Amino acid sequence: MKWHNIGRAVLTGLVGVGLALGASAQTLTSNATGTHDGFYYSFWKDSGDASFGLKAGGRYTSHWTKSTNNWVGGKGWETGSIDRVVHYSGTFGVDDSQNSYLALYGWTRNPLIEYYVIESYGSYNPANCEGGTDYGSFQSDGATYNVRRCQRVQQPSIDGTQTFYQYFSVRTPKKGFGAISGTITFANHVKFWASKGLKLGTPDYQVLATEGYQSRGSSDITVSEDAASANAGK
């Protein structure tokens, strides 16, 4: 997968779509965004049989086969926070031969920035964009994260077709497959990015996303945040 497919996938599903659902478990097979049991969610696919299950609280499930060209979905927060400490656990049902990733994903405005904290990926590292700039690495949550900036020129965004930057923090070593869990102290990423001149703007949504591109797999992920970071956002 080329790195730009990830952004295009999420954007197409998130812009201009709204759907509020109750707290009962549901399985989505059509593109939608909204809130469910206290969490924001997004689901988009361009074809095929990918499905997205809304479960209690911050839990979601997904399943897809190669009949789906590209899909992405996740649960999180309608308004992102630079101070959010995100916890996730569950299963990431892919392997090194499958083109998929698991990441904290979000947007800001003024400046318009698309960002990723990549926790695990399969056959393709989403930060491997052509013409990108590397900004070194830093330590957070028991791992090293490599930082890279990519530019999108006149491509879809939360504000329509725009030119904007993407920031990537890619975990090394990446998390494995199967049972998976971790913590993302997002403030550490924001601080390092800022030290390199990579500024964020006003937060838009922020989700813990699963993505698949011309691959097959499944996920069952529960996302939550520290109480302190939740209160800070109020």
Give the location of each predicted region.
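Bacterial N-terminal signal peptides that target proteins for export
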Residues: 1-11
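Bacterial N-terminal signal peptides
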Residues: 10-18
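N-terminal signal peptide c-region/cleavage motif recognized by signal peptidases
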Residues: 20-22
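N-terminal segment immediately downstream of the Sec signal-peptide cleavage site
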Residues: 26-78
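Extracellular-facing segments of soluble proteins and assemblies that are Gly/Ser/Thr-biased and enriched
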Residues: 73-139
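Beta-sandwich interaction modules
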Residues: 75-79, 151-200
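An exposed acidic His-Trp-rich patch
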Residues: 110-175
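Long, compositionally biased interface segments
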Residues: 178-234
